[in-house]
UniProtKB/Swiss-Prot annotation:
Protein name in UniProt: Large ribosomal subunit protein uL22c
Gene name of the record: rpl22
Family in the record: Belongs to the universal ribosomal protein uL22 family.
InterPro entries according to UniProt: Ribosomal_uL22, Ribosomal_uL22_bac/chlpt-type, Ribosomal_uL22_bac/org-type, Ribosomal_uL22_CS, Ribosomal_uL22_sf
UniProt KW Lipid biosynthesis keyword: no
An individual GO BP term: translation
PANTHER family with a match to the protein in the record: CHLOROPLAST 50S RIBOSOMAL PROTEIN L22-RELATED, LARGE RIBOSOMAL SUBUNIT PROTEIN UL22M
NCBIfam families named among the record's database cross-references: rplV_bact
GO molecular function, one term: rRNA binding
GO cellular component entries: large ribosomal subunit; plastid
Source species of the chain: Cuscuta reflexa
Assembly mode: Part of the 50S ribosomal subunit.
Amino acid sequence: MRKTKAPEIYALGQHISMSADKARRVIDQIRGRSYEETLMILELMPYRAAYPILKLVYSAASNASYTLDSNEANLFISKAEVNQGPAIKKLKPRARGRSYPIKRPTCHITILLKDISFYDSDSESVELNLLKKAR
């Protein structure tokens, strides 16, 4: 069925200044969707986490078009994950010479794209099965 092994193109964002749980809320909405559908969802999403994820999806698509010469209409998100990063530690000055520690969470986001055109294009059921498996 396959012409060759379908390569995975990825974009990795590290040390993004937000909680991993807040980023996962957005990532769960786009996992397994096509590239164009993902852009529409992220542009209309009201969360602060949507913007850095949108930049990563753009970056992964430009990586795919540069390395594989693939069309953006054939791309879909095969894997999207969010991992915790190191906490940025600061001290906030308080009254009477005291200070309180502030821990600002960070996260690492990975977006993997696959190109559907690497599979047989004559059977549309293969493409639909790929999209269903990725979800």
